[in-house]
């Protein structure tokens, strides 16, 4: 990735990584003080993750699957959900940066390819003009040769 070669890019990436912890702490605080955010934004991803984790561990151990997985307690689910959302935030920024770099590279490559195509077209036109000049000169040479043969006779 191009951004790794520039110090400013490395500093920015490091800053984004450093933001994830305060962002997670903010989510935990919001989860404690705002029941709507806790109930509908932070806890559902944690409970879903817990369900997948327990079921996959039981599958790996080849144990019987329970019908219902007991939910996590509210503080544990809040902590896990906030950590997951803060990591998703950092991942989203990283994915956005990768997308930005790729789109910029794609645009640059597309522009270069267009310039190459334009140069090819110009060169083809020049070759066509030169070919027409060669044909015209060849006809004139043949006409001059024919005229010289007529003069010699």
Swiss-Prot record:
GO terms for biological process, alphabetical: regulation of lipid metabolic process
Bilayer-crossing regions: none
One GO CC term, this protein: mitochondrion
Native source organism of the sequence: Drosophila melanogaster
Keyword tags: Coiled coil
InterPro entries per the UniProt record, alphabetical: OPA3-like
Keyword Membrane among record annotations: no
Similarity annotation: Belongs to the OPA3 family.
Name under which the protein is recorded: Putative OPA3-like protein CG43998
Ranges in coiled-coil conformation: 101-153
């Amino acid at each position: 990735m191009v951004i790794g070669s520039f110090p400013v890019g490395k500093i920015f990436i490091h800053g984004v990584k450093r933001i994830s912890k305060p962002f997670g702490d903010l989510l935990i605080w919001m989860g404690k003080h705002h029941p709507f955010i806790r109930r509908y934004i932070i806890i559902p991803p944690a409970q879903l993750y817990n369900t997948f984790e327990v079921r996959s561990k039981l599958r790996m151990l080849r144990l019987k699957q329970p019908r219902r997985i007991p939910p996590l307690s509210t503080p544990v689910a809040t902590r896990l959900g906030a950590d997951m959302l803060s990591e998703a935030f950092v991942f989203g920024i990283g994915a956005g940066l990768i997308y930005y770099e790729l789109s910029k590279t794609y645009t640059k490559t597309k522009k270069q390819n267009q310039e190459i195509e334009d140069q090819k077209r110009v060169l083809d036109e020049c070759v066509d003009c030169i070919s027409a000049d060669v044909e015209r000169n060849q006809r004139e040479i043949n006409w001059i040769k024919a005229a010289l043969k007529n003069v010699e006779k």
